[in-house]
Amino acid sequence: MKFKIFILGLLICFTSCKDEVVKKEKEPLIMVEQSEMSLLMNEMFAFNESIKQQIKDGKLNNDFPEHFNKIHTAVLTDSTVRDEAFKKDAQLFLDAQKALFEVETTEDLKMHYNNAVKACISCHEVTCVGPVPRIKKLYVK
């Protein structure tokens, strides 16, 4: 009899100590809208990827996209970033990018293109460092 009571007690103990699984509702993911500058930077990256391929093929088929000048006015994710250093770096990038479309030889194209990539990296080393590894992939070797 004592044994049956002992077994019954163990059963009650084990069944009452069961962890109840409470299902938590997953919070919906909130997509953050990209800033105007972020969208422009992504477009610049894609454009420069195509330029890289054109340089490898030996001929540049594009013109400078004038809307890249919006780098000076596009709304930033963090508005405090637009300081004098940012303005200077943005202009250096634009100058290097425009120089691409004024050269004659493939070697000059490569040099000016890599200068434009270098201008991107120098700015991104100070501001918004996240994309630096991605930008480095743009170099023409």
What are these regions (language model features)?
Residues 2-8, 19:
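Sec-dependent signal peptide recognition
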Residues 13-16:
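C-terminal motif of bacterial Sec signal peptides marking the signal peptidase cleavage site
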Residues 8-10, 63:
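A periodicity- and composition-biased signal for non-globular, repetitive helical segments
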Residues 18-141:
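Sequence context surrounding c-type heme c attachment/ligation sites in exported
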